[in-house]
């Protein structure tokens, strides 16, 4: 039997460990893993070496090093780039986030391009690149606007890194946009930082588990090795758990807190949580990967039952009054440097505007749940949660992409490119384009006057637009959306049309805001 070498970055993360566990059930696969030279990763490496012997090769390095990336991918049949610095670390150390999410992606792409023959390349992206959604447009799909939230260095960096893959010289690539991931230690991991308060109560979320994500990657390798999925490559996918994992921020907290005898309203207060500037949505195209690879199992409710079964001591929380848990476990986190409440109290205007719309809007939230309409309880007039949750609703309430979306990428012609560009406030300058190869770069101009090159697939099918308007440490979507109906149709779901804020980090890494002129 021929063996296949899969090179992986990011194998020590929650998703990565699940992927290794599942992929190693394929007898024909060997792994080469790039680890940071840190205590936790060395310990994990020793454990895998004991478990898998010479089927796993581990070396220590850094994605910042092109030489390390080249060593990782040399001679591989497949390369899986899962490496990422995610929140809350990305919030505290945006420099580290850039190292992995931008520079690391660039080095991985360049290393794969340099190989002869090239390995097939799978790049794991994130739902965070879409930016905020609420009950006005809870459903989304690949091709929707990519508007990462202000101060989200993770989302912005992953957006930039993903684009490097799409218009690269890699022959066989795939991008998988991972949604929010459920893993066994999720609850405990979120009671040590103010990050939990970034999640609005009325945000749509479609979760996936680490285990199912691992099964997906295993099945991708298995089916591609067997030659069963030639159409998988050169496409972008949303990875979600499907109908049984669709919920909201409010109901996610409710499900987790039920294990310790409480719920969202017992432990939280409306004014503690952001009302916008998050990410996540329900994927209308979530079943594309499932139909190809059959990776899903169980449900959102099953996940929490399994967590409680593995952590019986959580049930001891039921004998403690909710007010005590609220004070000792959650209220103390309001003082954390990553807590929206602390930002407001310290007068951080940038973050206050970004996450609430302003100080007045935050103050109006208060502590009384009777004054806060909860979407999933049908308390928002005109928006029936159960109706919106139904996939039949999605089909008639999707965002426009500005062209005839029924056409495949091979069928789109210049009229489609011109129409899509116009809907984005710009132009396609290659009027001699004819339908055929939608992966060859053409020339575009955005409303800001930037001229850039990108393939029709990157723009029409993947949702990217002008790379010169997307600048690290800067978020100016208030301005950009005014001339870009493609952006405006969703940006103005959570931003007033007269908002004109430029959000940015200064040279000291301080979150700032000013009028965009």
Regions found by a protein language model. Name each.
Residues 4-26:
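N-terminal Rossmann NAD(P)H-binding glycine-rich loop of SDR-like oxidoreductase domains
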Residues 50-100:
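NAD(P)H-binding glycine-rich loop region in Rossmannoid oxidoreductase-like domains
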Residues 64, 96-107, 148, 152, ...:
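Glycine-rich NAD(P)-binding loop of the Rossmann-fold in SDR/ketoreductase-type enzymes
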Residues 85, 106-151, 174:
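Conserved Rossmann-fold NAD(P)-dependent oxidoreductase catalytic core, especially the SDR/UDP-sugar
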Residues 126, 162-185, 231:
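Conserved beta-loop-beta element that borders a ligand/cofactor-binding pocket
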Residues 199-225:
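Substrate-positioning beta->alpha
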Residues 222-286, 291-292, 296-306, 311-323, ...:
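Mid/C-terminal beta-alpha module of Rossmann-like enzyme folds, strongest
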Residues 375-517:
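Functional cation/ligand-contacting sites centered on basic and imidazole/sulfhydryl donors
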